[in-house]
């Protein structure tokens, strides 16, 4: 969602407490892996975003890189990845017609090397946008060409590599109206249709997603996202999925029923759903109480994805707390992921395990039916 900067200093919990060895830890499935459990539950993947090589810029963490890379690329925890920043407009086209795919290519290459799905992110977004786009007074004709040229170059460069593209990111206000981005001010909702239409032409095999935050419970904003799905479907323009970013708060998280209702609201429109940027921040320093709330929140949102057939996968927005964007945008909050600074696991890790393994205890028929629908 946002560009993470340098290392934040988080008070470190005692190892046993941080690893979730207190009350309610549950069985350690570290030898199994979240992606393995997710696939047994009928999901397509459980993944983590990464800012490789951006992570290398975090001074003082050099000794952490080998273990980070082992978990990210060489363990059974993750079956997919997303470049956190490397495919965004600011980085790939900083000047008009001048493209730099270096960071995105590193992640794409590693995903290919280690047999992981690649979710690509994000073609058109108002934030982390190159200044030349935002600061120019465009005519409609000129801005259409800018959008088409950008998507053609970027999606074309990664053609055949991306399981899915977040084509348009965060186009909505909280009340469900359109955000007044440079794209909307000049073109109105036409820019959304143009972006999806162009992406479909350039990479016809990629799943095309609308992606946004605060879509994880029924609200005016979820209704706005449904309007976007209907807009594209009515125009016969491909849209295959809606991404629920799921940047949540441990102390005030939605219920399981809220999540299920929101996900079903989209799948009933004939699109798949994925949790695309999952993290659940809490007030720091972490306590036993808010870590328990975080565990419950992770269990609810992952459990909802497992329980609704059209929800195909989960991506956490990195997995290692020191690499999270959260502390730089929310003062006094952090520890939003599943691994602490010492690489011990949050109690929330075991909440995710519980959400995934509860599904595996259901009938083989329900899992087979789900897999058949995913392959359809």
Swiss-Prot record:
<comment type="pathway">
    <text>Glycan degradation; xylan degradation.</text>
</comment>
<dbReference type="InterPro" id="IPR001000">
    <property type="entry name" value="GH10_dom"/>
</dbReference>
<feature type="signal peptide">
    <location>
        <begin position="1"/>
        <end position="18"/>
    </location>
</feature>
<keyword id="KW-0326">Glycosidase</keyword>
<protein>
    <recommendedName>
        <fullName>Endo-1,4-beta-xylanase A</fullName>
        <ecNumber>3.2.1.8</ecNumber>
    </recommendedName>
</protein>
<feature type="glycosylation site" description="N-linked (GlcNAc...) asparagine">
    <location>
        <position position="358"/>
    </location>
</feature>
<feature type="active site" description="Nucleophile">
    <location>
        <position position="277"/>
    </location>
</feature>
<comment type="similarity">
    <text>Belongs to the glycosyl hydrolase 10 (cellulase F) family.</text>
</comment>
<keyword id="KW-0325">Glycoprotein</keyword>
<dbReference type="InterPro" id="IPR017853">
    <property type="entry name" value="Glycoside_hydrolase_SF"/>
</dbReference>
<keyword id="KW-0858">Xylan degradation</keyword>
<keyword id="KW-0119">Carbohydrate metabolism</keyword>
<dbReference type="GO" id="GO:0031176">
    <property type="term" value="F:endo-1,4-beta-xylanase activity"/>
</dbReference>
<dbReference type="GO" id="GO:0005576">
    <property type="term" value="C:extracellular region"/>
</dbReference>
<feature type="active site" description="Proton donor">
    <location>
        <position position="170"/>
    </location>
</feature>
<dbReference type="GO" id="GO:0045493">
    <property type="term" value="P:xylan catabolic process"/>
</dbReference>
<dbReference type="Pfam" id="PF00331">
    <property type="entry name" value="Glyco_hydro_10"/>
</dbReference>
<keyword id="KW-0732">Signal</keyword>
<keyword id="KW-0624">Polysaccharide degradation</keyword>
<comment type="function">
    <text>Endo-1,4-beta-xylanase involved in the hydrolysis of xylan, a major structural heterogeneous polysaccharide found in plant biomass representing the second most abundant polysaccharide in the biosphere, after cellulose. Is most active on birchwood xylan (defined as 100%), moderate on beechwood xylan (96.8%) and soluble wheat arabinoxylan (84.5%), and weak on insoluble wheat arabinoxylan (19.7%). Hydrolyzes substrates into a mixture of xylobiose and xylotriose, but no xylose. No activity was detected in the presence of barley beta-glucan, carboxymethyl cellulose-sodium (CMC-Na), and Avicel.</text>
</comment>
<feature type="glycosylation site" description="N-linked (GlcNAc...) asparagine">
    <location>
        <position position="100"/>
    </location>
</feature>
<keyword id="KW-0964">Secreted</keyword>
<feature type="domain" description="GH10">
    <location>
        <begin position="55"/>
        <end position="355"/>
    </location>
</feature>
<keyword id="KW-0378">Hydrolase</keyword>
<dbReference type="InterPro" id="IPR044846">
    <property type="entry name" value="GH10"/>
</dbReference>
């Amino acid at each position: 969602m946002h560009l993470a900067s340098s290392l934040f200093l988080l008070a470190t919990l005692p190892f046993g407490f941080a690893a979730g060895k207190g009350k309610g830890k549950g069985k350690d499935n570290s030898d199994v892996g979240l992606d393995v459990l997710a696939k047994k539950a009928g999901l397509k993947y459980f993944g983590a975003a990464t800012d490789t090589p951006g992570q290398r810029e975090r001074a003082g963490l050099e000794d952490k890189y080998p273990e980070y890379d082992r978990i990210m690329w060489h363990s059974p925890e993750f079956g997919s990845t997303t470049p956190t920043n490397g495919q965004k407009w600011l980085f790939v086209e900083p000047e008009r017609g001048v493209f730099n795919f270096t960071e995105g290519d590193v992640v794409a290459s590693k995903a290919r090397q280690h047999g992981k799905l690649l979710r690509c992110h994000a073609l058109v977004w108002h934030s982390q946008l190159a200044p030349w786009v935002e600061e120019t007074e465009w005519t409609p004709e000129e801005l259409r060409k800018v959008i088409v040229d950008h998507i053609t170059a970027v999606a074309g460069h990664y053609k055949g590599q991306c399981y899915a593209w977040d084509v348009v990111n965060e186009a909505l206000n909280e009340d469900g109206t359109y955000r007044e981005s440079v794209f909307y001010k000049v073109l109105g909702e036409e820019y959304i249709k143009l972006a999806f239409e162009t992406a479909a032409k350039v990479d016809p095999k990629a799943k095309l997603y609308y992606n946004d935050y605060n879509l994880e419970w029924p609200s005016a904003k979820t209704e706005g996202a449904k309007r976007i799905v209907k807009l594209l479907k009515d125009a016969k323009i491909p849209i295959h999925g809606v991404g629920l970013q799921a940047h949540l708060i441990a102390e005030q998280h939605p219920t399981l029923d809220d999540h299920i209702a929101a996900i079903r609201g989209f799948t009933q429109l004939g699109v798949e759903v994925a949790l695309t940027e999952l993290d659940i921040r809490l007030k720091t320093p972490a306590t036993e109480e808010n870590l328990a709330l975080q565990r419950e929140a992770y269990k609810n949102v992952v459990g909802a994805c497992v329980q609704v057939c059209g929800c195909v996968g989960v991506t956490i927005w990195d997995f290692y707390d020191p690499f999270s964007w959260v502390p730089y945008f929310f003062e006094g909050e952090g520890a939003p992921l599943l691994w602490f600074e010492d690489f011990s696991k949050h109690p929330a890790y075991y909440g995710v395990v519980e959400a995934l393994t509860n599904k595996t205890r259901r009938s083989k028929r329900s899992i087979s039916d789900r897999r058949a629908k995913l392959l359809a």
